[in-house]
Amino acid sequence: DEDPADLVFYLRNENEANEDEPGSRYELRREYWTYALPIIQKAHGEDGSFSNVNPSRDNWINGFFGIGGFYLCCVANFDAARAEVVFGRGNKQENKAAFDSLYTHKTEIESALGTTLQWNRGDDIKSSKVFIQLNNVRIENETDWLQMANFHADWTKKFYDVIVPYITVDWQ
């Protein structure tokens, strides 16, 4: 017989969705990235920034370009999608210096891309980022997935082609 004093009980918050539960936001995200990742990987090529990336339960996936702490990021939210270049090293000053260096080329970069970008130095946080956002799409709406995946693929590839060369000059 088991001694009741040896029993362990685990409590679970009924208000929190189980990440493996069908219909949870985690399952939805993994399904979206499973759909989108091949499109993103194809845009970047066989050995590209996203070649070693797997579907995730998070609302983001990162692609890398060979400079530690700096990366491309695809974000899929319930109200928008974003493509980002992130300066996310552990050293805040290095992130700000890299961002500031890139910002000196803002006009050239935006001219080459044919659009204005969002430049977020993030003075109150460690990281900095440059991004573009696609509004009026929702990860929960599967009919938006192709548009979102193409947006992620196209813009992270454009960022890789246009922005990353400016970063590699100073931070390789």
Where do the PLM segments sit?
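Hydrophobic transmembrane signal anchors and adjacent membrane-proximal interface regions, especially
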Residues: 9, 35-38, 139, 169
